[in-house]
Amino acid sequence: MNFQENLAALDLEYLWHPCSQMQEHQNFPIIPIKKAQGIYLYDFNDNAYMDLISSWWVNLFGHNNAYISQQLKNQIDNLEHVLLASFSHKPIITLSQRLCQLTGMDKCFYADNGSSCIEIALKMSYHAHFLKNQTRRKKLFLSLSNSYHGETLGALSVGDVKLYKDTYTPLLLKNLITPVPKNDSEIENSLNALKRLLDKHGEEICAFIAEPLLQCAGNMHIYSAKYLKQAVLWCKQKNIHIIFDEIATGFGRTGSMFAYEQCGIKPDFLCLSKGISGGYLPLSALLTHNEIYNQFYAPYEENKAFLHSHSYTGNALACACANATLDIFEKENVIEKNKALSEFIFSALQNALKPLIERQVVSDLRHLGMVFAFEVFLQTKERLSLAVFKKALKKGLLLRPLNNTIYLMPPYIITHEEIKKAIAGLVEAIDELKKAENK
């Protein structure tokens, strides 16, 4: 047993991995990673893997980014962490100012992961309505079908991915779900369904929560800004807060700094995480407006304070990484560069996948900014997503398909040559799985 194999065995003895059926790893070992650089991960046998999903959508500017790493080192020599109740620090003050200036919002409230950020948004929305009218509480939330907002109980309550949700249904908050349009031809029907729901329950709804334009865990479903604009307008008319979950879509992933910018809508609450620290350290931020903040601003004796906290809220090291990430956006004109890179990747995929599309092995190739996805149809002995994952790893590619959906969400620093190599390996993997169908 070599060092890599020994580590993998120790891992299985002591670790319980997220979103995993651990029994599968008895025959398919965990891969311990020794180091990473750029888009590559390296195991202890020096095998390299292209990180084509940005390590669960968090890594924007490559692993071991020289600038972010240096800013982290600078910060760790001064302050690693301090409680955020009654204390503060320069990195979080700077970050809060920058985020508010970027979004036109007024206040930031911090946590350390996306699900917690959603929980804060739900609580804050409910609490704000409660403070405005204590005798008539709004008790429901509204979300879109096929949505995903995290895996804590509140976040699961407003999601609609059954794989994560069904087991815990008896524990969840009551929530209303309205159909997201599957394509532009369904916009009118989806809006009509929403109108009926709002006519019946509008006065009971605290907030409408949505992932603007792109439902990532919902098989990378892209939907129309036209639908979202009208949905938000009707909700606002009913005094329903708007929560935009940009945990996965924020920081340039959809082609603009934030996806909601493409809709001409500003939410009451904006949830950010994942790419906020460049993939270095856990951090999330909920942004809101003074209109909300001022409802909680009162003498202590009035019991209006928003009493929510996490031990590592606003960690100084994470905030230093987040500021470094924003520096890169500012200095390197990332959004404009990504537009050209996005078109190059999509064109390369169109050309490479054309034979597979003609053979009806692949369909529905789509993209939004730096997100690329398509459906694949294969008969495999094990579930399709696992078969693709394993085959891709043999090609040196890290993918994590969602059911039949293969997607790419690479770091923004990926080069044209790396793209060509990755797509060639991806096509080879699909071809080999197709050829193995009848064996």
UniProtKB/Swiss-Prot annotation:
As for subcellular location, the record says:
Cytoplasm
User: What are the annotated GO cellular component locations?
Assistant: cytoplasm
The lineage's top-level taxon is Bacteria
Record-marked site positions (Participates in the substrate recognition with KAPA and in a stacking interaction with the adenine ring of SAM): C19
Q: Which PROSITE patterns match?
A: AA_TRANSFER_CLASS_3 (PS00600)
User: Does the record bear Cytoplasm in its keywords?
Assistant: yes
Residue positions annotated to bind substrate are W56, Y148, K274, S309, R400
Record EC number? 2.6.1.62
Q: Where would one find the signal peptide in this protein?
A: none
Which positions bear N6-(pyridoxal phosphate)lysine? K274
- Name the principal localization, coarsely classed: cytoplasm
Q: Which UniProt keywords apply?
A: Aminotransferase, Biotin biosynthesis, Cytoplasm, Pyridoxal phosphate, S-adenosyl-L-methionine, Transferase
Report the cofactors: pyridoxal 5'-phosphate
Q: What does the record note on quaternary structure?
A: Homodimer.
Q: Which family does it belong to?
A: Belongs to the class-III pyridoxal-phosphate-dependent aminotransferase family. BioA subfamily.
Q: Tell me, in a sentence or two, what this protein's role is.
A: Catalyzes the transfer of the alpha-amino group from S-adenosyl-L-methionine (SAM) to 7-keto-8-aminopelargonic acid (KAPA) to form 7,8-diaminopelargonic acid (DAPA). It is the only aminotransferase known to utilize SAM as an amino donor.
Q: What is the protein's name according to its record?
A: Adenosylmethionine-8-amino-7-oxononanoate aminotransferase
Specify the species: Helicobacter pylori (strain J99 / ATCC 700824) (Campylobacter pylori J99)
Task: List the top taxonomic levels of the source.
Answer: Bacteria, Pseudomonadati, Campylobacterota, Epsilonproteobacteria, Campylobacterales
